[in-house]
Amino acid sequence: MSLSPKLICKNVWKLYGDNPKEFLKSHNNNPDKEIIKKSGYIQAIRNASLEVYENEILVIMGLSGSGKSTLVRCMSRLVDPTIGEIFFENIDMGKLSKNELIEIRRHKMGMVFQHFALFPHRTVIENIAFPLEVQGIKRKEREKSALEIIDLVGLQGRENYFPKELSGGQQQRVGIGRSLAVKPELWFLDEPFSALDPLIRKEMQNEFLKIQNSLKKTIIFITHDFDEAIKLADRIIIMNEGRIVQIGSPEDLIMKPADDYVKEFTEDLPRERLLSVKSIMDDKKETNSSATVYEDEKIFSILEKVLSKGSVSVIDRSNNIVGSLSKETVSKFINN
């Protein structure tokens, strides 16, 4: 993940109702939610500011109606924000014409939704190649690109199947492949696996990480499943009533929840299986033991060693000592 922003949102609001821009202006662009409600408006997004870094997987979470999908649609300008600025690759999206926005979405953005709407009368290869057909690319060239994507998403040998001949997981692979056909710089996925059976869902999550490891895309991924978010995310956004409550790494949200709303998402999770040694280690580097553990190991995997040795040194993958971990710290973590 690079710290160079791929997409920036600044003070984005989305209200539904009569002349919402004037309403916001009359309240200094910061009305409280009670005034919004009493005035007959629906608050979809409230003053959202964030940066999406190049090559990161940014997961957006929240309950139904929290504004997740609306925020993503504002980011891609499928929905116009009421006020606020959105920059993609330093381009002010609010200043682009309708045709310029269409061109950016055709060539720079990929989108996958829960209901992926494959063309039933087109084969796998034809579905995946469709965005290239829209771009006017010749058939031979677009089919060559589509075959490469078919290999990438694990559908080798099924290129001439129709959607009705595929399982749900295979159909979703086609949807993912179609969204990758234009080689997008920014990839939006809105609950792409939520309709799948648990085993297929896990398989698709693993496949998704494999694809990301190969392509290094900038990804904005919506889910309501915290286990899925932790597995996939570099950072997570938690939303509530259109407002961004917290942005941070999975470990930040588990160890330092911003409020009770965030805490509710994380309190029943098996923390020892999700958190790394780094999240609970001590900064001091001196120990009475020669035993070591890696900072990125999950806590459950080193419990026996720490509890038997009393204390261990924590090292990075270059074998540099970066901290220590004591039996007392581990015991306190387990019992909290």
Segments predicted by a language model, with ranges:
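The conserved cystathionine-beta-synthase
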Residues: 288-320, 325-336
